[in-house]
Amino acid sequence: VIIPTPIFPLYIPIVLLNGAKPIFIDTSEDGFILKPEKLQKAIEANKDTVKAVVLNYPTNPTGVTYDRADLEALAAVIKQYEIFVLSDEIYSELTYTGKHVSMGEILPDQAVVLNGVSKSHAMTGWRVGITAGPADVIQQIGKVSEFTITSVTTNAQRAAEEALKNGMDDTQPMKEAYMKRRDFLIKALTAAGLTVPNPDGAFYIFAKLPERMHDSWKFVYALAREAKVAVIPGASFGPGGEGYVRISYAASMADLKLAAE
């Protein structure tokens, strides 16, 4: 299973627990975007064994997203092989520039799209996810789901249905609040000497540490001890993550201002 990194670390143990091997592509030199030529190279090097490619966008931890041209270029590569793309689009409604484009729209016969209401409606604790893809694939996923989680509780399903039917406009004020927090943090972190990209989505900043502080684990431990501020070491997100830290702006503006001080 090909996994572009840095990426949400949960994918890696899931691949391992299913007896598969993760194949990492470091995207840190490419603006944290998976490039089609690097994808093709990785597939060709493992052509007899590759079954899937993982995409997550807007991405945790970088906040980077893919536009239509990016996705079409990747789809052109994937179409050449009998493989699937597992497209985790849980942050789709938290896209700040342009409109989110789903890989399911571009590659319907080979894409399995994951989404839910956790991020779009701040319903993380309800544990309601959505999977869409080719009918035969979804049928097999249903079998696995039945014997692992059985089903989502009825009240959670009804709450998610209400959110999707009558609460789609609720995301907008939340997104506007995130953008204000993002802009505040970018300004504060830049003033502190960190290199900070402008995230296109989600609610994370993946800030590059000064070279003298390159060890992200040491940095986050020191920050927690001395400033009582918790961030995540970039090294925990796979190859290409070292030398960075992930900062969440899902916290309140008051807490972010206190942390910045």
Q: For each predicted feature, which ranges?
A:
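PLP-dependent class I/II
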Residues: 2-261
